[in-house]
């Protein structure tokens, strides 16, 4: 199967229904995640989306020669180098790719927070924006843990009610 054939099938994901009845899309590939966001924007379904991405960042896979079994045990939230590279990846690539996917390159993510504990580091990014006369809030949560290089991303958009 060539790369073109793989791309033509659409994003690979699984759909989970949470206890509260919410439909949640889960991705394991960054490209599939971005493709899905772009599709939702084109379908005008962009203001009420909740999806999660669980993946190894590209810099980790590059160091391991694209073999997840060769990823070093030190690639986790206890490594200053890993945390620094992950933060750069998130700020310069992941958020930029999300902005491009939802067709909002001017999005700035002004609401930034970082929480550190012994077993994980969490970055939260948020911004209110408007697209096609619909106002909504974009929230991105990025989590890295102490037990591995796998990164969890929680992407959520919620419509903002107009003030009456």
From Swiss-Prot:
Keyword Phosphoprotein in record: no
Keywords for the protein's UniProt record, in alphabetical order: Cytoplasm
A Pfam short name: RGI1
GO cellular component, one term: cytoplasm
Compartment list: Cytoplasm
Top-level lineage group: Eukaryota
Single Gene Ontology BP annotation: energy reserve metabolic process
Primary role: Involved in the control of energetic metabolism and significantly contribute to cell fitness, especially under respiratory growth conditions.
Family per similarity comment: Belongs to the RGI1 family.
The name this protein goes by in its record: Respiratory growth induced protein 2
